[in-house]
């Protein structure tokens, strides 16, 4: 009951997207910050770069910001006032480096006064204005074949959308077609060539309809594509990745499924034999995980990505820990709280430790005043006058952790449970005497704290300051491994990279290989990889080492011809190394209809939102002549009820939607599936057992892994 109350109250904290000046439609996706541990960030996104996730949480473009301009030509070619602006609307939350005057924007929009031959055709163009950090995309069209006057619909957005603008351009072009038809209908109905200058006074609802299309459809579409972080799929031949994947599969089967429930084998068999290939062929196909447990959903997504593609085939970039080497007393460490970059210096201390057997008591030994903790706005005495438990078996440092956590607010670093794991009392007595404590500053928004941290925590063990997860995150199907709340010991990913040859035993070598994945730090943005190596190789092929070619001598029929062998082996580049990542993401608080793989909060309306987005896909497909999609499918996975079902919607000849639901797993039993699928489930189960038992031979491990994740159609 408590978990449900917490989960319900947390939903009210999210502010609707673009609520400052628009009424939000169904297409809106809200991208809100959420808690995720550093190891999951590395597994899902290939990096734990703090700047990437801070941008996701705080610096979102989109907040619905845009500037819409509708303008037209008046037919006065020689006049300076040849262009008239019908609408110039800027949303309140549209912030750019410089406000571009309308005169300059009109030059960008209409450009040269030279006309095209075909006046009936509309044209689109994209302009990047680097000085203002904006992107301007424009639709220019004519009233009819006889008219020579151009009408333009232009939109300014921040340049953050540039990587995905061409990706989602088919959808944007469809919406621009709607806007164009709306204005053309107004001109035809009123038998005029010009839009009204004061459209509000003339009650021109068509202009308002165009503005509403941008507010409710085009801008949320760009936001859904560009604001959501996309998953990084590790290479299929990476031994650390395979070992980590096997570890997660083993934990799921042993701790969550148990000996009777075969939830994971059935789900993986469905992907392997049926849905993975469908997801690759049809962009309208989705996998949606409905859950109230973010951590379990993210672990399941990591498991499912092995069956999806394309996987990265380049070089994995490893993080460099320059501060990992220990040094004698006097070494420097960076501030873990991130409040200041000024390093504190370690010096030996003569502070003593009191241990009693009388439970809670007032310490009678005078402490070093250096380790007292007081509030900035208080004149009270230090921490040596506080009551402390003898079970903590440490000096003032443990009480400092307790005091700091009790006084900290949302902006503070971590929670009390997290600080207990960091405090010297949670470690062995031997380690507490080896290195003296060190003072650190906390970046709390309400108070100033000094935390006593053991010196053996180096600067490379810094984690992203994040709020602690709520109880609701561990309520549903509890994960029995130590939670990130209760542990903060040095993880494998935070160690100094050590050569494999330095390990003496096979067990140490396997442990090192498995932990290598946590050292990955790929250069990336929210939706793209920064693959400089592939770019340099392509440049070298074209410029530094150009391909060989033959020249055909000119004659009376043709000029000189350069013949390039396009079938050259060097030109057969691997298309898997694409910068733009696929639309797969992890847990998001709200459903994003534009992504193919995601997990979202389960509510009473979750399934209805998914079905409604599927119907919209078919509607958009009818408007786009290039698309021939007549059906769309979604694999719905409910972790709360452990149900798996495939929802398919088709459109018949009468344009009616027909929905079919195929239950794969319900109430712990396999649904009415084909014999081939039943055989596939048994085969997948056997492959998983062999994979879990194979730990010594890396070649056999890679072979078994590739066998199980290779998609095979039934």
UniProtKB/Swiss-Prot annotation:
One of its GO terms (biological process) is protein transport. Keywords: Amino-acid transport, Protein transport, Transport. Residues 423-447 are annotated as: Disordered. It comes from the Eukaryota. Residues 634-712 form the dDENN FNIP1/2-type domain. GO terms for cellular component: cytoplasm. Residues 61-236 form the uDENN FNIP1/2-type domain. Residues 244-620 form the cDENN FNIP1/2-type domain. InterPro entries: DENN_FNIP1/2 (IPR037545), LST4_longin (IPR041153). Belongs to the LST4 family. Involved in extracellular amino acid uptake. Required for the protein trafficking from the Golgi to the plasma membrane. This is Protein LST4. The lineage of its organism: Eukaryota, Fungi, Dikarya, Ascomycota, Saccharomycotina. The gene is LST4.
């Amino acid at each position: 009951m408590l978990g449900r109350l917490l989960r319900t109250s947390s939903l009210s904290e999210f502010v609707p997207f673009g609520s400052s000046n628009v009424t939000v439609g169904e297409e809106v996706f809200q991208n809100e910050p959420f808690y995720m541990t550093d190891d999951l960030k590395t597994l899902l996104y290939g990096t734990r770069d703090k700047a990437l996730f801070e941008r996701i949480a705080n610096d979102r473009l989109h907040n619905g910001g845009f500037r819409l301009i509708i303008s037209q030509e008046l037919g006065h070619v020689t006049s300076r006032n040849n262009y008239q602006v019908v609408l110039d609307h800027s949303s309140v939350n549209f912030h750019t480096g410089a406000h571009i005057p309308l005169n300059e924007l009109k030059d960008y929009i209409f450009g040269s006064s030279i006309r095209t031959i075909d006046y009936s055709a509309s044209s689109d163009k994209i302009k990047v204005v680097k000085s203002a950090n904006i992107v301007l995309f424009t639709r220019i069209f004519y009233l009819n074949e006889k008219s020579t006057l151009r009408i333009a619909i232009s939109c300014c957005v921040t340049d953050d959308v540039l990587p995905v603008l061409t990706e989602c351009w088919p959808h944007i072009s469809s919406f621009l077609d709607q806007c164009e038809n709306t204005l053309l209908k107004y001109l035809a109905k009123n038998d005029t060539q010009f839009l009204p200058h004061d459209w509000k006074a003339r009650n021109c609802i068509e202009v308002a309809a165009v503005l509403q299309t941008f507010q409710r459809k085009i801008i949320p579409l760009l936001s859904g594509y560009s604001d959501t972080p996309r998953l990084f799929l590790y290479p299929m031949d990476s031994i650390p990745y395979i070992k980590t994947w096997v570890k997660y599969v083993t934990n799921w089967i042993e701790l969550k499924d148990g000996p009777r429930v075969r939830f994971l084998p059935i789900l993986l068999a469905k992907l392997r034999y049926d849905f993975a290939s469908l997801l690759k062929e049809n962009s309208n196909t989705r996998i949606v995980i409905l859950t109230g447990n973010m951590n379990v959903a993210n672990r399941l997504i990591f498991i499912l990505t092995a069956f999806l593609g394309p996987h990265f085939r380049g070089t994995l970039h490893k993080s460099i820990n320059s501060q990992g080497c220990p040094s004698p007393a006097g070494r420097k460490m960076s501030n873990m709280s991130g409040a200041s970059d000024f390093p504190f210096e370690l010096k030996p201390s003569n502070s003593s430790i009191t241990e009693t057997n009388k439970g809670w008591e007032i310490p009678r030994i005078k402490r070093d005043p250096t380790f007292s903790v007081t509030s900035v706005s208080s004149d009270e005495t230090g921490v040596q006058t506080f009551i402390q438990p003898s079970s903590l078996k440490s000096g003032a440092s443990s009480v400092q952790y307790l005091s700091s956590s009790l006084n900290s607010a949302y902006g503070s670093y971590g929670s009390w449970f997290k600080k207990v794991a960091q405090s010297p009392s949670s470690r062995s007595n031997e380690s507490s005497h080896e290195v003296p404590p060190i003072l650190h500053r906390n970046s709390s928004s309400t108070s100033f704290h000094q935390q006593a941290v053991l010196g053996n925590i180096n600067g490379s063990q810094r984690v992203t300051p994040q709020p602690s997860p709520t109880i609701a995150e561990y309520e549903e199907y509890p994960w029995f491994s130590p939670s990130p709340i209760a542990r903060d010991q040095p993880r494998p990913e935070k160690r100094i990279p050590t050569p494999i040859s330095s390990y003496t035993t096979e067990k140490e070598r396997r442990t090192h290989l498995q932990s290598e994945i946590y050292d990955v730090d790929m250069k990336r943005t929210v939706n793209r990889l920064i693959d400089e190596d592939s770019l340099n190789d392509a440049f070298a092929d074209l410029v530094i080492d150009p391909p060989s070619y033959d020249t055909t001598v000119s004659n009376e029929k043709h000029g000189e011809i350069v013949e390039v062998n396009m079938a050259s082996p060097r030109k057969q580049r691997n298309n898997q190394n694409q910068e733009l990542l696929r639309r797969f993401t992890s847990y998001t608080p709200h459903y994003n209809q534009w992504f193919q793989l995601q997990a979202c909060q389960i509510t009473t309306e979750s399934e209805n939102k998914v079905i409604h987005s599927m119907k919209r896909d078919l509607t958009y497909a009818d408007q786009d002549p290039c698309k021939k999609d007549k059906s769309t499918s979604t694999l719905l996975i409910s972790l709360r009820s452990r149900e798996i079902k495939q929802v398919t919607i088709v459109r018949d000849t009468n344009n009616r939607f027909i929905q079919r639901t195929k239950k794969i797993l319900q109430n712990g039993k396999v649904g009415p599936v084909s014999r081939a699928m039943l055989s596939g489930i048994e085969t997948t189960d056997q492959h998983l057992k062999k994979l879990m038992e194979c730990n010594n031979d890396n070649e056999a491990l890679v072979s078994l892994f590739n066998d199980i994740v290779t998609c095979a159609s039934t």
